[in-house]
Amino acid sequence: MDVFKKGFSIAREGVVGAVEKTKQGVTEAAEKTKEGVMYVGTKTKGERGTSVTSVAEKTKEQANAVSEAVVSSVNTVATKTVEEAENIVVTTGVVRKEDLEPPAQDQEAKEQEEGEEAKSGGD
C-alpha cells in the first residue's frame, strides 16, 4: 500500500516541478519580450515611446496570464491523472480505498498549504 502512496506522491511532485519550470520559462520570456519592445521604444523615441511602453506592459501582463492558465490546467490534469490511477488500483483490488486516503489531519494541512499558495500566486 505504501508503495502506491509513495508512487502517487512522486508523480504529483514531478508534475508540480514541471509546472513551476513552465511558469518560470513563460515569465522569463515575458521579461525578454518587454526588454525587446522597450529597446525599440527607446530607439524610436517621441510619441511612440509611450505607446511602446504600454505595449510592453500589456505583453508582459498577457504572458503572465497565459502562464497562470497553463499552471492551472496542468495542475488539473495532474490531479485527475493521479485520481484515475488510484481508482484503477482500487477497482482491480490491488489496494483498498481507505489505504490510499491520507489521514484527515494531513489532508487539512495540505488544503491549507494549497490555499496559501493560491493567495501568494504560487511563489
Swiss-Prot record:
Keywords from UniProt, A to Z, are: Cytoplasm, Cytoskeleton, Phosphoprotein, Repeat
Entry's Gene3D superfamilies?
A: Helix hairpin bin (1.10.287.700)
Q: What are the Phosphoserine sites (modified residues) in this protein?
A: 67, 72, 120
Per the record, the GO terms for biological process are: adult locomotory behavior; aggressive behavior; cellular response to hydrostatic pressure; chemical synaptic transmission; peripheral nervous system development; protein secretion; regulation of cellular response to stress; regulation of dopamine secretion
Q: Where are the sequence repeats?
A: 20-30, 31-41, 42-56, 57-67
Q: Which SUPFAM superfamilies does this one have?
A: Synuclein (SSF118375)
**Tissue expression remark:** Specifically expressed in the peripheral nervous system. High expression in motoneurons of the brainstem. Also found in neurons of many other brain regions including the cerebellar cortex, thalamus, hypothalamus and CA1, CA2, CA3 and CA4 regions of the hippocampus.
Q: Where is this region: Disordered?
A: 93-123
Q: Which GO terms describe its cellular component?
A: axon; axon terminus; centrosome; cytoplasm; neuronal cell body; perinuclear region of cytoplasm; spindle
Subunit-level organization: May be a centrosome-associated protein. Interacts with MYOC; affects its secretion and its aggregation.
Record-given protein name: Gamma-synuclein
User: From what organism does this protein derive?
Assistant: Rattus norvegicus (Rat)
